C-alpha cells in the first residue's frame, strides 16, 4: 500500500510519520518545507499555488491529509487549495480527511472552512473517510494553560474541552488505511469532558504549583458554544 501524508511538518503530520516508520507501507510525504531527518521520500508541494501537487499524488493509493492552516491563508489552503488537490485524485483508492468535532455548530471562521472542505469532499468522486477529533491536549495547554500571569491562570474557566492525545488520533488514522472508504465516522474524542478551570486545577495539583486561577467571562456566540460543549461528544470517549 502506497501512502501519501500531506502537511508532514505539522503536529499531526509529525505524529503520523513517527508511527508509520517501521510499518509495511510505502510512504511518501509532502509539504512546503522539508522535515528534518526525513525517513521517507519527500516531495515539495504548495496548496496555495498548486505547485507540485501532481507529482505529490502520483503513484499513491491512500492520502492522509494532515495539511491545515488555522491562522494564515486559511481559506486559500482549506478550501481553494483543497479543491485543487481534489481535482488531481481520480486514481486514489482512499482519501482520509482528519477534521474537528463540532465544526458544523461552532461559529468560528477556521471551523466553517473545514466544514466547507468536508462538503467538497463528500460531493466529489473521491472515495473518502472523514475522521473528526476533539482538540489535542497540546492545543489546550499551549493556547490557554502554558504561562500563568503573575502566578495566576487567567482563563475563560467555563468553556469545555474533551481533549485527546495526538498520537492516539494518528494511530487511529493509520488503522483506517486498510479499511477502505467509510464516509464520515463517529467522533474520536478524549476520555473526559472538563471545563478549562477543572483542567487548570488538575495541572496545579499534578505539578504541585502555587498558581491561582482567575476565571473570567466572555460574551459572544463562539464563547457560548464552547460553554455548551459543542466541541465535545459525551457519547464518544476514546483516547
What do the predicted segments below correspond to?
Residues 6, 75, 79, 107-115, ...:
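Short-chain dehydrogenase/reductase
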Residues 35-92, 100-106:
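NAD(P)H-binding glycine-rich loop region in Rossmannoid oxidoreductase-like domains
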Residues 132-138, 155-175, 184:
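Substrate-positioning beta->alpha
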Residues 2, 10-11, 167-239:
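Mid/C-terminal beta-alpha module of Rossmann-like enzyme folds, strongest
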Residues 1-25:
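N-terminal Rossmann NAD(P)H-binding glycine-rich loop of SDR-like oxidoreductase domains
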Residues 25-32:
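Conserved glycine-rich Rossmann-like NAD(P)H-binding loop of the short-chain dehydrogenase/reductase
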Residues 99, 119-139:
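Conserved beta-loop-beta element that borders a ligand/cofactor-binding pocket
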Residues 6, 30, 66-67, 95-100, ...:
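SDR active-site strand-loop-helix element
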Amino acid at each position: 500500500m502506497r501512502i501519501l501524508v500531506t502537511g508532514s511538518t505539522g503536529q499531526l503530520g509529525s505524529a503520523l510519520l513517527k508511527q508509520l516508520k517501521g510499518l509495511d507501507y510505502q510512504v511518501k510525504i509532502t509539504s512546503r518545507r522539508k522535515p528534518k531527518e526525513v525517513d521517507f521520500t519527500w516531495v515539495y508541494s504548495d496548496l496555495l499555488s498548486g505547485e507540485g501537487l501532481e507529482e505529490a499524488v502520483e503513484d499513491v493509493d491512500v492520502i492522509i491529509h494532515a495539511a491545515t492552516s488555522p491562522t494564515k491563508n486559511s481559506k486559500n489552503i482549506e478550501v481553494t487549495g483543497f479543491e485543487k488537490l481534489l481535482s488531481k485524485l481520480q486514481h486514489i483508492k482512499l482519501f482520509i480527511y482528519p477534521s474537528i468535532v463540532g465544526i458544523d455548530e461552532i461559529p468560528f471562521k477556521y471551523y466553517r472552512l473545514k466544514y466547507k472542505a468536508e462538503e467538497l469532499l463528500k460531493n466529489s468522486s473521491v472515495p473518502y473517510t472523514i475522521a473528526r477529533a476533539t482538540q489535542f491536549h497540546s492545543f489546550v495547554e499551549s493556547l490557554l494553560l502554558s504561562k500563568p500571569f503573575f502566578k495566576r491562570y487567567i482563563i475563560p474557566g467555563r468553556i469545555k474541552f474533551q481533549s485527546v492525545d495526538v498520537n492516539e488520533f494518528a494511530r487511529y488514522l493509520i488503522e483506517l488505511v486498510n479499511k477502505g472508504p467509510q464516509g464520515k465516522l463517529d467522533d474520536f474524542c478524549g476520555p473526559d469532558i472538563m471545563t478549562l478551570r477543572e483542567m487548570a486545577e488538575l495541572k496545579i495539583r499534578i505539578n504541585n504549583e502555587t498558581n491561582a486561577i482567575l476565571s473570567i467571562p466572555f460574551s459572544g456566540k463562539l464563547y457560548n458554544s464552547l460553554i455548551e460543549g459543542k466541541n465535545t461528544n459525551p457519547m464518544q470517549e476514546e483516547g
